[in-house]
């Protein structure tokens, strides 16, 4: 267990609060700006167990008006057990600082050396002014987002009446195990990931909570608050620089918007200055020598090294050269000089040199030393700053064209089945890989995406060597595979040159007029264009929550695939230009399924192009599949000689097939990749079947034996259609359902 785990638990705590309070937009924004990983906790019960809150939970349930979230339980616990201070003038509620281990330092600390910052100043309650408090269990200030306990710093007026309160945590029995675990992690604490470091460069104010921040500001409110705390704790006699002076001396480094998720990153400009952690480095190195001798938590060997890095590295700013522009090649040389590779996304490196074994009081000096080292080493490399998208809101004319292509009319709308359908996964342990379908309609889209998710899960990445873990992914693994699958589908539809991602903004961009019926979805779309597959993957990972949890996840993917291919090319793919992608009763057409599987919305499933002579000299071209597909396709219509599925779909690159049976699409797959390249493996093999709509409660495993002949059909109505589909590829094969009830 390391600090990354602590961060994910804290983030899960905030997500649970947002979910229970119905703050859906904030919830979506948080998942976009801070995507989940394997360590994220998605169950309230699991979160309660990890934090050892069972006692508080039972006590809360017995109350007349119980609290609804774990975050409120923790908050009330501290408010009830800490007590009030004697300072009636400030009327503040102190929050204890969680001890941070230090090296062999058992001397009692003076009052001025402890860092106990009040979480909320009641005297400022009417104007909503807030202050931040040192993050529990970590010797660093790395959460300008306020994503730990939701504390945001006001830039209007700080509290100068903070009073330290020494609290005995021995009475906190129910929470002691969780907090002790946090304290003991510091010796092996990895650095903040790249995303966290990028977030540190974003200024925050009260407007960010409502998503109203339009651009960067010159300095961060938390920086000025930290400087005032330094003045009080170390009794510095010299005058510190004002924020205006710091602004003049700081160099504009990178201009990033307050909302990084699915938005474009504008280029850096000299007239919009962003306060980066590198800008803080110089002022911290100036204040450091004047701190009292109580900074014993960091060895004498470490402090000169940190100062030399800030003085010699091009990352540090000089007061005489404060107006010179920092170039990206200087940043790369800085990483090279330190012997550190620029960190990749979600990769952490150890930055703490301390090997502590006993907790002591948190000191501001330790925080500053840790902050300097992290700011230098873990600043995002230039490649992470190059993710740019071209975005534009949808307009009325484009919305009309899309509706005509989808439904054949601008007066048709998406049905409720489509609007409610997202790419959420099954909670049954043996079916965690499966996407759940709520109602009929978009089953073709779900089956195609399911096949691509299985491709990523079974045959790409780390799980391909461990068959026991393939079909039991963690929540983070399956979400990651979903993001990669969506990126593959869109990149393939865009001809592997570009992709367009359609995301719902929640606000209509135009007023419907004329022959157009609004449906509440198309009118809110913002379209993001990307021309790099790497940027596309990163972008989808940041916004995958809209596809997985909604709203309109299935619709967004369908529209993104259409726009990536372009409306004109989709029409050219059709055999009949007046065809459309969604048929009667909201069912997916073969063209839509082919678009998701192969990147082309062709109307047929045979190979290549067939010329049809009408007899009067006119030749009609029927377009089929042009190349071998990653995901295959089997159809019951072939059993009835209505169509012929070509080998490009029957023998795909991966042993995964979308099955069309009885006007419904489902998925069939094998765990053996050699099934498609070694005829000996085709003698006897297993196929797994999944239907997101069939209320499937257990794994369905079919054993196919091609050495035996299927029994004669005494009554063809009793033969499961799935068996008939299987026999369109493996002629006459015997199918054993292994105890599962055959699906008729």
From Swiss-Prot:
The modification Phosphoserine is found at residues 143, 220, 224, 295. InterPro entries: MINDY-3/4_CD (IPR025257), MINY3/4 (IPR039785). Its EC number is 3.4.19.12. This is Probable ubiquitin carboxyl-terminal hydrolase MINDY-4. The keyword Hydrolase applies. Probable hydrolase that can remove 'Lys-48'-linked conjugated ubiquitin from proteins. The active site is at 443 (nucleophile), 664 (proton acceptor). Residues 290-299 have a biased composition (Polar residues). Residues 211-358 are annotated as: Disordered. Disulfide bonds: none annotated. Belongs to the MINDY deubiquitinase family. FAM188 subfamily. GO terms for biological process: protein K48-linked deubiquitination; proteolysis. Pfam families: MINDY-3_4_CD. SMART domains: DUF4205. Residues 300-310 have a biased composition (Basic and acidic residues). It catalyses: Thiol-dependent hydrolysis of ester, thioester, amide, peptide and isopeptide bonds formed by the C-terminal Gly of ubiquitin (a 76-residue protein attached to proteins as an intracellular targeting signal). The keyword Phosphoprotein applies. Residues 265-277 have a biased composition (Low complexity).
């Amino acid at each position: 267990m390391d600090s990354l785990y602590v961060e994910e638990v804290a983030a899960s705590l905030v997500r649970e609060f947002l979910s229970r309070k119905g703050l859906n937009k904030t919830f979506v924004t948080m998942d976009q700006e801070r995507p989940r990983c394997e360590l994220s906790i998605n169950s309230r019960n699991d979160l309660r167990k990890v934090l050892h809150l069972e006692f508080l939970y039972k006590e809360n349930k017995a109350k007349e008006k119980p609290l609804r979230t774990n975050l409120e339980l923790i908050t009330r616990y501290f408010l009830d057990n800490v007590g009030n201070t004697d300072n009636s003038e400030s009327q503040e509620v102190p929050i204890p600082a969680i001890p941070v281990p230090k090296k062999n330092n058992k001397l009692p600390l003076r009052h001025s050396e402890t860092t106990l910052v009040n979480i909320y100043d009641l005297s400022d309650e009417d104007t909503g002014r807030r202050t931040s408090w040192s993050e529990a269990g970590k010797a660093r200030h790395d959460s300008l987002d306020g994503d730990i306990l939701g504390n945001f710093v006001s830039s209007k007026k700080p509290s100068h009446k903070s009073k330290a309160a020494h609290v005995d945590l021995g009475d906190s029995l129910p929470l002691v195990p969780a907090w002790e675990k946090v304290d003991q992690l510091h010796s092996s604490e990895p650095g903040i990931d790249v995303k966290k470091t990028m977030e540190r460069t974003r200024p925050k104010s009260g407007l960010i909570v409502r998503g109203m921040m339009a651009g960067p500001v010159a300095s961060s409110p938390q920086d000025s608050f930290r400087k005032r705390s330094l003045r009080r704790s170390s009794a510095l006699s010299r005058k510190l620089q004002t924020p205006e002076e710091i602004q003049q001396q700081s160099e504009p480094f990178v201009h990033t918007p307050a909302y990084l998720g699915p938005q474009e990153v504008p280029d850096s400009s000299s007239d919009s200055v962003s306060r980066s952690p590198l800008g803080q480095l110089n002022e911290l190195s100036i204040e450091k020598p004047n701190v009292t001798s109580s900074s014993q938590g960091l060895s004498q060997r470490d402090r000169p090294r940190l100062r030399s890095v800030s003085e010699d590295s091009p990352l540090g700013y000089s007061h005489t050269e404060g107006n010179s522009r920092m170039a990206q090649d200087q940043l790369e040389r800085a990483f090279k000089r330190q012997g550190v590779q620029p960190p990749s996304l979600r990769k952490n490196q150890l930055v703490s040199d301390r090997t502590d074994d006993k907790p002591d009081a948190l000191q501001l000096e330790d925080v500053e030393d840790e902050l300097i080292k992290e700011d230098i080493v873990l600043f995002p490399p230039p490649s992470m700053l190059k993710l740019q998208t071209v975005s534009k809101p949808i307009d009325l004319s484009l919305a009309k064209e899309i509706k005509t292509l989808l439904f054949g009319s601008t007066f048709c709308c998406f049905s409720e089945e489509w609007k409610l359908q997202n790419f959420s996964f099954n909670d049954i342990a043996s079916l965690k890989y499966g996407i759940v379908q709520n109602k009929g309609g978009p089953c073709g889209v779900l089956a195609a995406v399911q096949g691509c998710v299985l491709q990523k899960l079974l045959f790409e990445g780390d799980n391909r060597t461990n068959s026991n873990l393939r079909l039991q992914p963690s929540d983070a693994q399956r979400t990651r595979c979903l993001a990669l699958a969506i990126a593959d589908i869109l990149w393939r539809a865009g001809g592997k040159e570009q992709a367009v991602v359609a995301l719902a903004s929640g606000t209509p961009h135009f007023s419907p007029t004329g022959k157009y019926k609004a449906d509440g979805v198309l009118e809110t779309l913002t379209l993001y264009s990307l021309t790099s597959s790497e940027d596309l993957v990163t972008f989808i990972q940041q916004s995958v929550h809209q596809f997985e949890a909604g709203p309109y996840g299935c619709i967004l993917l369908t529209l993104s695939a259409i726009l990536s291919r372009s409306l004109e090319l989709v029409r050219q793919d059709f055999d009949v230009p007046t065809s459309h992608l969604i048929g009667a009763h909201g069912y997916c057409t073969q063209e839509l399924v082919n678009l998701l599987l192969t990147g082309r919305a062709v109307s047929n499933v045979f190979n290549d192009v067939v010329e049809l002579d009408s007899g009067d000299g006119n030749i009609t071209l029927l377009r089929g599949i042009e190349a071998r597909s990653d995901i295959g396709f089997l159809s019951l219509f072939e059993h009835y000689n209505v169509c012929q599925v070509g080998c490009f779909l029957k023998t795909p690159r991966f042993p995964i097939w979308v099955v069309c049976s009885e006007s419904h699409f489902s998925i069939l797959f094998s765990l053996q990749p050699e099934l498609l390249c070694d005829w000996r493996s085709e003698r006897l093999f297993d196929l797994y079947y999944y239907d997101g709509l069939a209320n499937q409660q257990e794994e369905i495993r079919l054993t196919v034996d091609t050495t035996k002949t299927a029994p004669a059909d005494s009554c063809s109505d009793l033969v499961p259609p799935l068996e008939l589909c299987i026999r369109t590829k493996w002629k006459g094969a015997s199918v054993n359902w292994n105890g599962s009830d055959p699906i008729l």
